[in-house]
Design a protein with these regions (language model features):
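Typically the conserved alpha-helix immediately C-terminal to a functionally engaged Cys/Sec
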Residues: 69-83, 104-107
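Short, internal strand/loop/helix patches
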Residues: 108-157
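Short active-site neighborhood of thiol/selenol oxidoreductases, capturing the structured segment around
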Residues: 52-72, 77, 90-95
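Bacterial Sec-dependent N-terminal signal peptides
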Residues: 1-25
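Loop/turn elements at helix/coil->beta-strand transitions in domains of secreted/extracellular proteins
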Residues: 55-59, 85-90, 118-123, 166-169
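Thiol-based oxidoreductase modules, predominantly thioredoxin-like and allied folds used
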Residues: 63, 88-105, 120-132
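Thiol-/selenol-based redox modules, centered on thioredoxin-like
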Residues: 137-140, 144-191
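N-terminal "domain-start" segment that seeds a small globular fold
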Residues: 19-52, 72, 137
Length: 191
């Protein structure tokens, strides 16, 4: 009798483990990571911008500001874009006023500032929020591991860089203080 109970318990335990493994596997499959291509946004000029048009390209997404100590990075971003745009790199700027109110301008004022001061020709999107309760869906994707599959992060300041591979997946988050021309960034572009 005791032997029958033990055999019954072992058989039941194996069945439970098998069912738990199947549930875990299904759960992981249903948490498929998203990609950047699902997003459509507005440019500074109120035109539609569809990230799906960038399939097959490396994308650097940067939150920008016009009145920040890091604003001169616009020049490096533009030089990088000029150098590598024909090698499948696209830089996409998102002006944001989240840090010390360093992007107070309207979309039209930001567009004029970028063109006159830095000759910016890479795509610049309409001003958004990159953190807080009103965080834009693009930045929800960039900062939440459950969406991007890489890591949870928080935008720490203006000019934080998010590197997206040719499949539309986040592969690296770069500090605002790291210049766009840093070896780490150049290596990623050329890699």
């Amino acid at each position: 009798m005791f032997l029958a109970i033990v055999v019954s318990f072992i058989a039941c335990n194996k069945k439970i483990n098998k069912n738990m493994n199947a549930i875990a596997s299904t759960s992981l499959e249903s948490q498929e990571i998203e990609d950047i291509y699902q997003f459509k946004v507005k440019t500074l000029n109120d035109e539609d911008f569809d990230f799906s048009t960038l399939k097959g390209k490396k994308i650097m997404i940067v939150n920008t500001a016009s009145k920040c100590g890091l604003t001169p990075q616009y020049e490096d971003l533009q030089n990088l874009y000029d150098t590598y745009k024909n090698e499948n790199l696209v830089i996409v700027g998102f002006p944001a006023n989240n840090f010390a109110k360093q992007e107070p301008g309207t979309n039209a004022e930001i567009a004029e500032f970028c063109l006159i001061n830095y000759g910016v020709t890479f795509p610049m999107m309409a001003k958004i929020s990159v953190k807080g309760d009103d965080i834009h869906p693009v930045y929800q994707f960039l900062t939440q591991k459950s969406k991007n599959g890489l890591e949870d992060s928080e935008v720490s300041w203006n000019f934080q860089k998010y590197l997206i591979n040719e499949e539309g997946h986040l592969v690296k988050v770069i500090s605002p203080k790291t210049l766009p021309t840093d070896e780490e960034v150049i290596g990623w572009i050329k890699g």
